[in-house]
Design a protein with these regions (language model features):
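Functional-site microenvironments in short loops/helix caps that host divalent-cation chemistry
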Residues: 1-168
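Conserved strand-loop elements at the edges of beta-sheets that form or border functional pockets
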Residues: 18, 177-180
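Residue-level signal for short, function-critical loop segments
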Residues: 100, 171, 190
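Polar low-complexity intrinsically disordered regions
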Residues: 147, 175-176, 192
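Short, P/G- and charge-enriched loop/turn segments at secondary-structure junctions
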Residues: 169-175
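Short, structured beta-strand segments at or near domain termini in extracellular proteins/domains
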Residues: 179-192
Length: 192
């Protein structure tokens, strides 16, 4: 975990990981911000407005774009990226990869740490997704609110298979349990 305590600053340049959903929400609230919705996150990660497979577009050479598969225990049963960078069993990188950049100028959406989003995790045939009204305007799945056990995580992370770098891939974790790959990206709404 990158956070070592309030008085220890050795890892301040690293992205915060090992967060719970509640902890990530509190970090954002302390800054006057919030977690993005899944829809906002996916829009940013799909090379908007072009709707690519990855934040950088459709180039499938994930290992040379995103900080994923960098651990000797890369998850997901797919190809590891050890040959494209160093093995890191400890955690995220300070800078991620320079190629992991969206058209909106957002860095590290495909790799480094996975990111909590506001939404409860539910399959797309669940009620929270079935009854959305059209046109869609930032839909959010809220089955049980803050009490919901599983929350959605988006994006790849340093020990994940390159599969997780795709903008449309969803993951989940227990909202109350800190997770080593889980980090936080805060957003602020436009307007008043």
């Amino acid at each position: 975990c990158t956070f070592l305590g309030l008085d220890e600053h050795a890892n301040d340049a690293f992205p915060v990981n090992c967060t719970s959903w509640q902890g990530a929400s509190e970090i954002c609230a302390a800054q006057g911000k919030r977690l993005p919705t899944e829809a906002e996150w996916e829009y940013a990660a799909s090379n908007a407005p072009s709707e690519g497979a990855y934040p950088w577009g459709d180039d499938a050479d994930v290992c040379n774009h995103a900080y994923v598969g960098r651990s000797s225990f890369a998850e997901g049963g797919s190809i590891a990226c050890h040959d494209a960078g160093t093995v890191n069993d400890v955690g995220p990188s300070i800078d991620g990869m320079p190629g992991d950049l969206s058209a909106l100028g957002i860095k590290n959406l495909a790799g480094n740490v996975a990111e909590w989003v506001q939404d409860d995790f539910a399959l797309y045939d669940a009620d929270c997704w079935k009854y959305v009204t059209f046109p869609l305007e930032n839909p959010r799945c809220a089955l049980g609110g803050d009490a919901q056990a599983d929350k959605a995580l988006r994006g790849g992370f340093w020990s994940a298979s390159p599969f997780y770098a795709r903008a449309v891939v969803r993951n989940l974790s227990d909202a109350k349990s800190p997770s080593a790959p889980a980090g936080v990206r805060c957003v602020k709404s436009w307007g008043p």
